[in-house]
């Protein structure tokens, strides 16, 4: 399994690049539009990769950061979401915007991605609602845990999100206490 490739970009297209390693091996790697915008031909970089082996192809998908790679890997595990659709999500939404859409149940944001309709957006949200903590960084994880706890207490997500915008606490326990005071 190839988990990362370091080398010089010898070819760059909007969603594809070729990386030549110091050993002379060149790898063709599919990339998101966001990744493409941040790299230049002739530049030495390291791309984290997800490798997909098929009967007719050995495909590499490249990412500049771990969050985008995790987002891609979570998406391709879902029934009916292939690598091309997952890359379309990576190209259309940052990992933070994607996470926000999952947390808020925002199908409108997900349907802006080519190839994702309302039904698929609802399924993505439903299937990833438990896995969203994997995508979160430390600053978001306590908010996700707080939202989950408050929902378990019977509060509605939209009301919780509005209250959390005005909360200042930086850990789960304090944020739950602060939110409960404002929700009461």
From Swiss-Prot:
<dbReference type="GO" id="GO:0005737">
    <property type="term" value="C:cytoplasm"/>
</dbReference>
<keyword id="KW-0227">DNA damage</keyword>
<dbReference type="GO" id="GO:0048476">
    <property type="term" value="C:Holliday junction resolvase complex"/>
</dbReference>
<dbReference type="Pfam" id="PF01330">
    <property type="entry name" value="RuvA_N"/>
</dbReference>
<feature type="region of interest" description="Domain III">
    <location>
        <begin position="145"/>
        <end position="184"/>
    </location>
</feature>
<dbReference type="InterPro" id="IPR013849">
    <property type="entry name" value="DNA_helicase_Holl-junc_RuvA_I"/>
</dbReference>
<dbReference type="InterPro" id="IPR011114">
    <property type="entry name" value="RuvA_C"/>
</dbReference>
<comment type="function">
    <text>The RuvA-RuvB-RuvC complex processes Holliday junction (HJ) DNA during genetic recombination and DNA repair, while the RuvA-RuvB complex plays an important role in the rescue of blocked DNA replication forks via replication fork reversal (RFR). RuvA specifically binds to HJ cruciform DNA, conferring on it an open structure. The RuvB hexamer acts as an ATP-dependent pump, pulling dsDNA into and through the RuvAB complex. HJ branch migration allows RuvC to scan DNA until it finds its consensus sequence, where it cleaves and resolves the cruciform DNA.</text>
</comment>
<dbReference type="GO" id="GO:0000400">
    <property type="term" value="F:four-way junction DNA binding"/>
</dbReference>
<dbReference type="GO" id="GO:0009379">
    <property type="term" value="C:Holliday junction helicase complex"/>
</dbReference>
<dbReference type="Pfam" id="PF07499">
    <property type="entry name" value="RuvA_C"/>
</dbReference>
<feature type="region of interest" description="Domain I">
    <location>
        <begin position="1"/>
        <end position="64"/>
    </location>
</feature>
<dbReference type="InterPro" id="IPR003583">
    <property type="entry name" value="Hlx-hairpin-Hlx_DNA-bd_motif"/>
</dbReference>
<protein>
    <recommendedName>
        <fullName>Holliday junction branch migration complex subunit RuvA</fullName>
    </recommendedName>
</protein>
<dbReference type="InterPro" id="IPR036267">
    <property type="entry name" value="RuvA_C_sf"/>
</dbReference>
<keyword id="KW-0234">DNA repair</keyword>
<feature type="region of interest" description="Flexible linker">
    <location>
        <position position="145"/>
    </location>
</feature>
<dbReference type="InterPro" id="IPR000085">
    <property type="entry name" value="RuvA"/>
</dbReference>
<dbReference type="InterPro" id="IPR012340">
    <property type="entry name" value="NA-bd_OB-fold"/>
</dbReference>
<feature type="region of interest" description="Domain II">
    <location>
        <begin position="65"/>
        <end position="145"/>
    </location>
</feature>
<comment type="similarity">
    <text>Belongs to the RuvA family.</text>
</comment>
<dbReference type="Pfam" id="PF14520">
    <property type="entry name" value="HHH_5"/>
</dbReference>
<dbReference type="GO" id="GO:0005524">
    <property type="term" value="F:ATP binding"/>
</dbReference>
<comment type="subunit">
    <text>Homotetramer. Forms an RuvA(8)-RuvB(12)-Holliday junction (HJ) complex. HJ DNA is sandwiched between 2 RuvA tetramers; dsDNA enters through RuvA and exits via RuvB. An RuvB hexamer assembles on each DNA strand where it exits the tetramer. Each RuvB hexamer is contacted by two RuvA subunits (via domain III) on 2 adjacent RuvB subunits; this complex drives branch migration. In the full resolvosome a probable DNA-RuvA(4)-RuvB(12)-RuvC(2) complex forms which resolves the HJ.</text>
</comment>
<keyword id="KW-0963">Cytoplasm</keyword>
<keyword id="KW-0238">DNA-binding</keyword>
<dbReference type="GO" id="GO:0006281">
    <property type="term" value="P:DNA repair"/>
</dbReference>
<dbReference type="InterPro" id="IPR010994">
    <property type="entry name" value="RuvA_2-like"/>
</dbReference>
<dbReference type="GO" id="GO:0009378">
    <property type="term" value="F:four-way junction helicase activity"/>
</dbReference>
<keyword id="KW-0233">DNA recombination</keyword>
<dbReference type="GO" id="GO:0006310">
    <property type="term" value="P:DNA recombination"/>
</dbReference>
